[in-house]
Amino acid sequence: EFGVSADYILGLTEKKENENKGNVHIDYNPQNKEVVRIPMLLMSSSFQLGKCLEFIESIEDVPQKEMAYAEYYYFSGQHEKAVKYSEMYLNHEDIMLKLSASLIYTFANLSLDRINSARIGLNRLREYLEKAMSMEIDKKTRACCVFVASAAHTLLHLPVGNIPPLSEYLNEFTKGMQLWGAYVLAHKTYLNKEYERSLGIVQACIMTSDKIYPIAFIYLNLVAAMDCMNMMEKEKAKEYFMKAWEISKPDDLIEGIGEHHGLLQGLIETCMKKEHPDDYARIIDITYKFSAGWRRIHNPDTNEDVADNLTTTEFTIAMLANRGWTNKEIAEHLDITTRTVKQHLTCVFSKLNITNRKQLKDFMLR
């Protein structure tokens, strides 16, 4: 069990803003001169599609604005700029800015293959979580530490310390942060192979949101596509993937698509390679960069051996074969011949030094 109330999953939980007047409300209001910051503001915000930069410019608090730019540069695949903006706030006195900075700094440096720098950011997140759980601090600050640590843990599939259940803190979050929290829960449920349940979380959150939260919605639709692929519902998977693409395209927020390549099991290829060749090439470039850096941390830290010597096409075919797809099903899904599938699998087996499909599981994503 998630420990999440039915009201939350159905989007009925609202923050009781008139209660606990002594506690600070952590929403952001551009008209409010007394700004109280939250981590990952852009990721958790609602804004009009195609107006991301205008939204960032409307933020009056300069540090929060600069961190929002760091988020934008990261989610649009501009990793050097993301590092430049985020590293300015790694040692800031405001914990909310430090949390955002450490998360962006970690992920952006992975894609730049700066593993030592990525480890610095990851270690900062572990330190903040440990302090948050051991010190007497307000619940909202602790909740935000858990929020960021959970995001890093889920997206990287790496240990980030002893993280308490995110569900215990959901009511402390703004609506956008709750949606991101739902993505984390759905992703964890996906990893537990409870695909229908994971999809249900996504559907409930999207249906009950009266605004669009672009970055959160991109990631929610991606995990829904992953769920559908594992239930062999290919057409529905394509619909969710294309929804993620439609949301990401106006502001060029393509990083998340590239990061999820392996888990999307060929959807990027089938939906984008012919129709959007230039965007496809950029997304695959993100995939290669992120995957290479991620494996350099993930494999030694988890004692797992996710394959690092396969092309994106080979990895996709290997993932599908590992999930039980026949050569014919793989060929139809990727619009290639069964002979081509067999040729790719022969290359995969040779590179991984294995002899059959059953051995693939040791080298694939979960």
Residue map of PLM features:
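Helix-turn-helix DNA-binding segment
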Residues: R295-T346, S350-T355, K361-R366
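DNA major-groove recognition helix of helix-turn-helix/homeodomain DNA-binding modules
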Residues: E1-Y8
